[in-house]
């Protein structure tokens, strides 16, 4: 990890790290110490959170205070979160979704931490957690990113209830969302759109508040998003050439999305999972092509180095504005085939 972070920084790109949120917010100190011992050079320290965590905003404030004390030059961000806009007991709405995002974003920001968050599954249409309803129409909760900057976004466009059958939440209640103090250009207002190509290939379309079909990236930019995250899987196909699903997050698809994001003035976060599919606290499975080298640390370092370097070169050649690179995903207990928090020092080095 130290070697890869050095390579990334030499390319003029900032390094991000993402960890599953520790049970105790002050437990992030252990992570910071391990990274320091290993000599990992990073700019962003991200924590992945679940929306149902009790006291989530106070938890993030405690994280923020701990990072300020132990690693004052690092920017703490929420690297993965999603909130429901509807649920079975009908207590969720676009209003509660927007409030939750706004409050968490606010909790991450202080006079010493630019903060920010990356919203997961933002591109999913009809998802209970996404920003687009079953017809692909942008929901008013998406506008929270712009409102938090003090933007005046028109969300009061006409909607035909017989066409959309949609509870617009914020629009109907005329909720005012104030600008967040201490927000800066460095504050991350990001969304994960790693499945965008797979969804558009399946025929999914996106519409703005006027009901006009628009590219997803334009809708996001117009609502205050400044970063998009792309997860990168090495080879997400089985022996028959069939995708494992999950959005078909290949390098080639990432390049397509990255070029469109750059076109609309957003930066790109490239998230290397160093796996053929999802990597998370429960699994860090080596890519098929690297499994033969599992017991050869030098060869494994070479594999990770070359894949990282070659992929970033492709993004550079394509003109994609890569603002940060995330090394691994939820690497609290390991990465790249190593899955034990007590023995992952070799990964960090």
Where are these regions (language model features)?
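N-terminal substrate-binding region of glycoside hydrolase catalytic domains
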Residues: 1, 163-256, 260-267, 275-303, ...
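Active-site cleft segment of glycoside hydrolase catalytic domains centered on the general acid/base Glu
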Residues: 1-40, 49-65, 69, 87-102, ...
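Short secondary-structure boundary segments
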Residues: 14-27, 57-68, 198-226, 272-273
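Active-site beta-loop-alpha junctions enriched in small/polar residues
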Residues: 18-23, 47-52, 81-84, 120-122, ...
């Amino acid at each position: 990890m130290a070697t890869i972070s050095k390579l990334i920084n030499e390319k003029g790109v900032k390094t991000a790290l993402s960890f599953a949120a520790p049970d105790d917010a002050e437990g992030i100190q252990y992570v910071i110490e391990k990274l320091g011992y290993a000599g990992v050079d990073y700019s962003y320290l991200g924590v992945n959170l679940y929306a149902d965590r009790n006291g989530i905003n106070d938890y993030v404030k405690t994280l923020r205070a701990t990072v300020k004390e132990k690693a004052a030059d690092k920017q703490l961000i929420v690297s993965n979160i999603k909130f429901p806009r509807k649920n079975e007991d009908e207590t969720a709405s676009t209003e509660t979704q927007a409030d939750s995002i706004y409050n968490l974003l606010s909790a991450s920001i202080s006079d010493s931490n630019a903060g920010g968050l990356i919203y997961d599954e933002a591109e999913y249409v009809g998802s209970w957690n996404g920003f687009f309803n079953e017809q692909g129409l942008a929901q008013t909760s998406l506008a929270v990113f712009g409102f938090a900057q003090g933007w005046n976004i028109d969300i009061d466009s006409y909607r035909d209830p017989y066409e959309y059958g949609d509870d617009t939440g914020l629009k109907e209640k005329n909720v005012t969302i104030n600008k967040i103090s201490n927000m800066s250009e460095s504050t991350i207002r990001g969304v994960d759109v790693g499945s965008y190509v797979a969804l558009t290939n399946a025929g999914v379309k996106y519409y703005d508040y006027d009901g006009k079909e628009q590219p997803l990236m334009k809708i996001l930019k117009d609502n205050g998003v400044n970063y998009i995250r792309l997860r990168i899987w090495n080879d997400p196909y089985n022996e028959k050439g069939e995708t494992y699903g999950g959005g078909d997050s290949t390098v080639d698809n990432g390049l397509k999305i990255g070029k469109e994001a750059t076109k609309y003035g957003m930066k790109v976060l490239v998230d290397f999972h160093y796996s053929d599919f999802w990597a998370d606290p429960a699994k860090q499975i080596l890519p098929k092509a690297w499994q033969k080298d599992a017991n050869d640390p030098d060869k494994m370092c070479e594999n990770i180095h070359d894949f990282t370097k070659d992929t970033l070169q492709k993004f550079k050649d394509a003109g994609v504005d890569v603002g940060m690179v995330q090394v691994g995903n939820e690497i609290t207990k390991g990465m790249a085939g190593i899955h034990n928090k007590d023995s992952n020092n070799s990964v960090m080095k």
